[in-house]
């Protein structure tokens, strides 16, 4: 052929000897690194390509001063450190210049030395020089100063990248792509070392990738072998290839416990042991099977020796299975092999009080737990030594293990539907089976070797199975050792005569451990141990392991998985005589003569005809023809699924021993399982998925199968670093106990939304886009600064110059952004307590922003990925070839998974590019964006008129669910018409500057015109003021810093000095909040007020009064200045005469009666009215009852303001001991004016409140430096609103809370709280002083639609409009975001029931308002440990609420259902609960279904449930009130046979009640029985809520108790009547 082309699929690393004769030279490393590439051409011919000439290498960072001579010295030093054996294998060292991956350095190039090696052994030996020496099994740590050479630190780079992957990167070879050999630059091997069709040797520079669209469309015909074995079981339990005495020890100890035998003497122990050896009879002791029988006399001698053994003298270890008895294995199941997929726990056998105790003393020591007694006894018999090839060590004879009986294999070519060969190797005779090739052998040994020959003969490319890595291959390997044929059996590789085993070095003077590949897979469900053969040239895929990683399934049993994937909905059913014709869409995996089960899916899933399996007569197009006439319930969703053969473990063991006919049944079952795995592989198109992920991340498919996602991301990042001339350092695993705030989950507003559609928008690729938009990357991070909770700088990173200035900060050619996140530590309160996550401070990271849209490495990677995914999805739309459509779909999915994994991997401590700051900065940006989206949408659709496509203009009232920020009397600083500054209460804004309140509902809005609010960014446009009544459960708190005071609700209303929002619940004494001193008015408006009049007005503000009022003697008016200082009174008396000469002024001595002198006036004849003068003062210096500073002075000259201040000080000021000016006020408005005035004339102010009189506000002013940090909180005070709030809320730790404040609000607005919306993220200055506050956010948004006549729009019309507006809202939000952020419309719910985080149900609509489907998450409908009746009742209630939207109708349905339970109208099938039986429990008597299993074994030994069996049971009545759970359940069959009463009450109180309580608690106030009970006024209900507040003052605890109270109320009105009937 003109050019050899192959698609790669598997790789192996080998080393050959250097010399021509391939001779081993003692004392010298003569091996050379070789890569074996296995490929296949389009005709199915395989090739092994030996790639030579590539030397593994890594880099060492050195000083810039190094030259070639220094490198030469360094190489000599390293060779010496490597030792004589490996030293000469370091063959190359050269200086290169590269960028480094961590920290921004303005693209500086650093000096590195590249070290190359001839062998992987030398590569590792040299790499280890940078690590500290560790004991075997310990994690290695890098040396703190690297490898020191001549007092110089050298740092290791890129040694974490496997040389195989390095070759891919250099040669641009995709590991699952096509390659070609350069003509004339390769040799074809005549004498082949492998069993491939072709074999080549080529230099790595002469193999290159092919990017050919024609080849990409070829489905290469891989030969795929599916494996499954069956084995015998001597005890009827799970087969064990090698057995010890643990089973006998367990039987003995349990016998003693169950029979309450406290003292076991030698005779009893001897009899129990002899029972196991069949010399005695005892039904509780199972027989053991020996490899070689012994006489009773020989056994007596062994027992005599055993009772004298003192096991505590030696440390001894034994593998046991450890499972949490409180967990339910219903979520984690296996194909009859539960035992092999439990987490192994290596236990040191301890627990005896005396190490000198013999085994009898240990057995009788009741202080020892059951496990210790069993394990101590078991080790006295003997055990296999794992460090000596599992050799048996012990006095007692070795036991016979269970045997392989059948090895099934089916082989299919990739792209074909069915296997072309079905093959079985059977021990002993077996009847023939249609289309199955059967080989029978007399011995197990011959059968094992026959399978090796079969593999070599058929030569598959891929071997698949279902848990064959967890059990089948390991079991066969162990049996081959037992049968002394391991060497021959293990020759399964494509490399001729290669044994697929490995030798593990265990230390000097210790024998090497011989084993097969062993690894562990850690998943959420536990750690799973894998053992399998590494077969060179054959890719292996274990589908159980694959599905555990990638699919969330209720069960992983093969029959369930097959039914889950191989099945589809039934569209319709037709009949032809006695046959049924089922129409369905996807029939992949189903064949003629298969069996299917019909499912009826409602709230629970019922098996039609009790799960009967129907034979498939034929398949025609999209039609399944059955041999029966079926009539399922067509009102439910109907689904067919593959029905796996019903052959249980016990049946397999029995049939195998029943002769050729029985073995044929088991063999057929075995072959069917092989076929099922083939079907699953084809249905899921596993090869295409692996191809795409492999090529994307530059890793072989085998890496994806056997290794975690870390290696694929390491490869991907390393390849991208290579493109940017950048090197990754080798780093240690993260070990600190610190953390950061993870991805945000917004607090839900739990409720039942029946009439208003609830829209949902979502960011497209939120976290990858956050990295791109903010340029978050290792190489863009300039510095970090970490602070504790007291704002003390505790750590910083980043390169500084000799003056301590960051070198790469504030460079003129770059912009920078800061991202702040909270830091946490895991702390144990006591040494034995569980560690809890506690906030420890915060950290700010600065990232550089490059010019011209250039990106750092991580953002550029993600930018490329997101772009590639969009491009791939566009290709999919235009592609017509189904094969390529599927390829492209798998490709875009691989891209999505990789992009979403990158930021998480950066935060994983085991990652090769770990950097907590990257992950934390990403989630912090994500939180910020989510909050932005909510605020923008709510603000932009608040009281607006929107144009819609089909309904014209509609009114929008985007629902604000802001945290009710401030009290009605709170001072607000505003500016009108960009010129006039005003200070007024927040409730006055609408009156003074608004156009009236709108939307008379729980929330009211008032648009503001030409108003700005003061913020940290200066004057910012203020759009509207919002108010609503304070809910009874809401709490208010006063926050006092040294320079600010504000009364707020306990929602997110404050802002930290870093700009981050914070709730009053989370602050404490010392927390720094955001403040910003208001600037003086630059407009300086002209005024008629003179300097002297301003002083009089200041004095009046401090101690003056005036008013017009009616009294019994008639209409009166008064005006007075008051003071006890005679000299001051004389001074202001003369000032008044001068400023107001039109009046007659007098001084009255009221010192004895009032304690002051008074200055008053009378009208002169012909002068202006006294009342006019008083009205002027009232209008200028009063706001209702509070004194204010006239606008003319606030906005006037500094001379006017200073004069007013002097008058104020004369009247009401004094000096403290430090000489500071001090003024007290009773009004927040007045105090706010004084603070502003003082600041405007150059004073610094501080605030305080008195402990005895908390409504007195003290302002202290000075022009000196203030002693304390003005931004820190110094007091947190509860507020009692006499109009509404009766209880005191504990917002913070009680040591930080002062006494409560009693606030009297204005009568009209006594229970309102207020918020502002501004352009500055809703920040605004509020309260006394300089504090900036913030309002909060909602979880969902609804548009509260109305037509132009203000009539509410609901139902389908509202749904259609909501979908349209939600799309516009997403587009609007995206307009103001950095690229590539895109806020996309996702879905709309109507109705919607939100129970809690990630627990909801609703009718989901996407684009079409006519196409809705029920969507649910986290509900009991999904849980498998609930009986079907729970799902039916709960689902029925949900259905009524969703469809009919009538609460009382749902209540009636539940009542009717409860009555049916009491009346025993419910079928037993609806009450059955199922759980899987495990092989081991710590406390077996506490596991109900395990107790039932024991009970079944006692009454029917032949049918005792075994580990892996799924037990069905129903709760029954038991007259003993102290009966444990195990005595309160029974099997349905036993209940019927013995007329046992079912405990229906249990199902109401323990199964049905709790989920329905949570559901109806959401609509409690809409339940008619609740209104009847509590009355329309709900006074008693509100009183209970108040009591709850008093008892549970912490918000989180209150919320929990409040929910419990609501659930309790539901129980009392809905369930208690029926519970009483049961009693």
Swiss-Prot record:
One Gene Ontology molecular-function label: DNA-directed DNA polymerase activity
Keyword check for DNA-binding: yes
EC number: 2.7.7.7
UniProt xrefs under InterPro entries: DNA-dir_DNA_pol_B (IPR006172), DNA-dir_DNA_pol_B_exonuc (IPR006133), DNA-dir_DNA_pol_B_multi_dom (IPR006134), DNA/RNA_pol_sf (IPR043502), DNA_pol_B_thumb (IPR042087), DNA_pol_palm_dom_sf (IPR023211), DNA_pol_type-B (IPR050240), Hint_dom_sf (IPR036844)
Alphabetical keyword list: Autocatalytic cleavage, DNA replication, DNA-binding, DNA-directed DNA polymerase, Nucleotidyltransferase, Protein splicing, Repeat, Transferase, Viral DNA replication
Signal peptide region: none
Pfam families named in the record: DNA_pol_B, DNA_pol_B_exo1
Catalytic reactions of this protein: DNA(n) + a 2'-deoxyribonucleoside 5'-triphosphate = DNA(n+1) + diphosphate
Family: Belongs to the DNA polymerase type-B family.
Name the UniProt record assigns to this protein: DNA polymerase
